[in-house]
Amino acid sequence: AYPAAFPDEVIEVMAAEPKICKYLDIPFQHISDAQLAAMHRRHTKAEAMELIRRLRTAIPDLALRTTLLVGYPGETEADFEELLEFVREVRFERLGVFAYSEEEGTYSAEQLRDDVPEAVKQERVERIMALQNEISLENNRRRVGRTERVIIDSRQGDFYVGRTQYDSPEVDQEILIPVGERRLLRGHFYEAEVTSAADYDLYGEVRTK
């Protein structure tokens, strides 16, 4: 889903329908108005923040994922600090960040100068991910003691590997459940209590009926 003109109908349906996962992937890319304009994004910082407010209000248990881009041509230190504060304020449940690189045939590659040094780009990626690691760990620790509906994807060694409704396969975190007497089946759902948390993984135990 993209931020510009995000439909209210989607928010209403997600809030009301229990069969829909409370998970959205919205690629904000940046939050500085100067960078958004340079990227030809069709929304402003104010519009992005208002969309997030509407989503959080309507769907309190929403897991919000985003992707960010640092080092785009013209990104200043002030632009980056604004982006860092955005991550700190919004506290995304899931987040990825990439360093800009020229892609042949694109507007930015043909019309803009790649003026942010590679070392600076990588430092900015690392700073955002260090902050996100802290946020993710804090978010996960708050889930300890909760019971989550989990789908089992696989067994790896001494653990069953599953996901909650807040996790997309292969890109998000997993919940690891120790192998015990009860056999868990791939593709089946179970109620699992979260027993401990790491920055990008949960650990749990399946509740017995």
Predicted regions: what they are:
Residues 1, 27-29, 65-69, 98-100, ...:
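Generic beta-strand/beta-sheet core signal
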Residues 1-80, 88:
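Conserved SAM/AdoMet-binding glycine-rich loop
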Residues 5-9, 28-40, 70-77, 93-119, ...:
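Flexible glycine/acidic-rich beta-alpha junction loops that bind and position SAM and/or redox cofactors
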Residues 8-13, 83-84, 136, 148, ...:
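A generic local structural motif
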Residues 24, 46-57, 81, 85-89, ...:
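Proteins enriched for Cys/Gly/acidic motifs involved in redox and nucleic-acid/cofactor modification
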Residues 26, 67, 87, 95, ...:
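Conserved, mostly hydrophobic/aromatic
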Residues 110-209:
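Terminal RNA-binding accessory module
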